[in-house]
């Protein structure tokens, strides 16, 4: 009985573990590897108005779905690790100030940047402000530029001399289109109840 209880606990813990997707070109496989993400993704989409494919494309670009992603540390003399150039962290790569604003506006004070649920909600929240800057929620390339530069930077045109950023924005748009097409054909499996794991 004890061994069976331990086995159930271990399976439960492993079921809660996060897997960095091995094939990030296929959203169906991403959600298969992390089935709990599906409801979190669609909850954010319904709450804030952005397509699930857009949310996932931005998170992919920002962190490659790594909950511990952070900018590389600067180096002194090219050798000694120093501070990071930005406070960006987690799936969404949100910086401290914007993350604090999100928590204050939503009341989600327990949010964590290493949590997919918190992060996908953050991205949806941030993109929901885009129409105020004249960006439609289906203009994925513009959404990404504004996400990267901030809405103030977008309105000032800070991106206009950043050809590399415009190329990245095109890639995000392409990923979003591909994810949307794939989502229409994803087989949806209901998660197994923990008490049926031995069936």
Can you name each region flagged by the protein language model?
Residues 2-9:
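Sec-dependent signal peptide recognition
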Residues 9-10, 21:
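Residue-level signal for mature regions of secreted extracellular proteins and peptides
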Residues 12-15:
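C-terminal motif of bacterial Sec signal peptides marking the signal peptidase cleavage site
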Residues 18-194, 198:
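Catalytic glycan-binding domains that act on GlcNAc-containing polysaccharides
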């Amino acid at each position: 009985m004890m061994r069976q209880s331990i086995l159930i606990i271990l399976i439960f813990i492993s079921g809660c573990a996060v897997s960095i997707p091995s094939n990030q070109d296929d959203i169906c496989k991403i959600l298969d590897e992390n089935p709990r993400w599906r409801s979190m993704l669609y909850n954010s989409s319904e709450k804030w108005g952005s397509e699930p494919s857009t949310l996932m494309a931005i998170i992919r670009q920002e962190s490659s779905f790594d909950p511990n992603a952070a900018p590389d540390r600067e180096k002194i003399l090219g050798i000694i690790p120093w501070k990071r150039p930005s406070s960006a962290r987690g799936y969404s790569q949100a910086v401290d100030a914007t993350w604090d604003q999100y928590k204050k506006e939503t009341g989600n004070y327990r949010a964590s940047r290493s949590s997919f649920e918190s992060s996908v909600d953050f991205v949806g929240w941030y993109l929901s402000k885009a129409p105020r800057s004249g960006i439609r929620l289906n203009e994925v390339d513009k959404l990404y530029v504004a996400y990267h530069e901030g809405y103030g930077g977008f309105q000032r045109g800070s991106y206009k001399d950043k050809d590399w950023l415009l190329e990245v924005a095109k890639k995000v748009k392409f990923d979003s289109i591909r994810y949307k097409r794939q989502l229409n054909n994803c087989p949806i499996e209901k998660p197994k109840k923990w008490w049926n794991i031995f069936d």
